[in-house]
Amino acid sequence: FDINIERIDELNLGHDRTLEVEDGLLNSVLDTDNGKSVGLHVCANKEAIKKCNIFIVTVPTPTDRHNRPVLTPMIKSSEIIGSVLKKGDIVIYESTVYPGVTEDEMVPILEKVSGMRFNQDFYCGYSPERINPGDKEHTVTKILKVTSGSTPEIAEVVDQLYKSIIIAGTHKAPSIKVAEAAKVIENSQRDINIAFINELSKIFNLMGIDTAEVLEAAGTKWNFLSFKPGLVGGHCIGVDPCLLYTSPSPRDKRQ
């Protein structure tokens, strides 16, 4: 489901403009008339998702010009899902967020719109998106997936769901907040380390030292994490550190 009708029409014609999925593979699983028992059905009609019992939200979480997280795509998605939510349904979020967004920000929206109670009538899970765009070797099924659920039973359901898809396996986190935090730091770590190497590269250049040779020498130690100078960008890595320093502190929540 997507609100972008142009995107839906394109996928139904068997083409993915991002080139993450080849046309042949897409066409082999596509269900354009919703007649298959198993297949990919893409639509922009909210009515078509009413019969679903598991909803997976994969929308972006950008930042504004003040580097504050913009949760609007997640909020709108939660409102749409809340309007069709049924007893026993599970809502799984994959968007990168600061710890607490799923349970403290999205759950109240689901409850308000659906009129149902969290962990009694419906449940939630969180499994951070792990993809490497443009990488044909480390595809989505070959990257280990972190999973979590709002109760131990739901955590197991979510974990088994992803295990049926992810060849590389899964890691079941003890809570949704742990899974949320894990995603933020894995991206932030890359941003920080690459930025650090970039600064060192500037210093070494002024000193007439070859950075590549320095990294090669340092890399002879078993626990040295090797990062090369380069660009840090994309829609996630450069943004995710902002999620950490803008997340509400425990003191803020008490007040």
Spans of model-derived segments:
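Rossmann-like NAD(P)(H) cofactor-binding subdomain of soluble oxidoreductases
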Residues: T63-R130
